[in-house]
Amino acid sequence: MCKEGNTIATLVDIVRPVVAPVIPKPFELVDIEYEKLGGNYVLSILVDKPEGITVEDTADLTDIISPLLDTIKPDPFPEQYMLEISSPGLERPLKTAQSLMNAVGHYINVSLYQAIDKVKVFEGDLTAFDGETLKMTYLDKTQQKTVTIPYKMVAKARLAVKL
């Protein structure tokens, strides 16, 4: 828990409107995470751009974002934290409808709130997304199958690495 009963989700909700407007083009704010790793709290701001981000990019973004976080009143952070600006990596989260639209044609992993045909996690190629339903092809043992998933049933989605 954070100060004054704020949850981690609330902390992220407080930080997002401060950070999002200052992320310059061509960068995209992918996600903000706040978690305790070992004995330290870490605020991770995941950014990307079409050609990928560099160490210099993360340093420049840190110089922009860090002073702004210190201006949030009242201070939403329960303790000292480390600020981490990084790439979302190969298995970047797909948290918005737009990120799913951009992922059409890519190999993804989708976790559901409720099972479809006794399956709660699908991994395969996202063949279509219309804003309301995802269409995926996946391998069930040795058989290629297709599944249609209502967007509202998606608990979590991310790009996946095909092995």
From Swiss-Prot:
The keyword Isomerase does not apply. Transmembrane segments: none annotated. Its main location: cytoplasm. It comes from the Bacteria. SUPFAM superfamilies: YhbC-like, C-terminal domain (SSF74942), YhbC-like, N-terminal domain (SSF75420). Signal peptide: none annotated. It is found in: Cytoplasm. One of its GO terms (cellular component) is cytosol. One of its GO terms (biological process) is translation. Belongs to the RimP family. HAMAP family: RimP. Required for maturation of 30S ribosomal subunits. This is Ribosome maturation factor RimP. The gene is rimP.
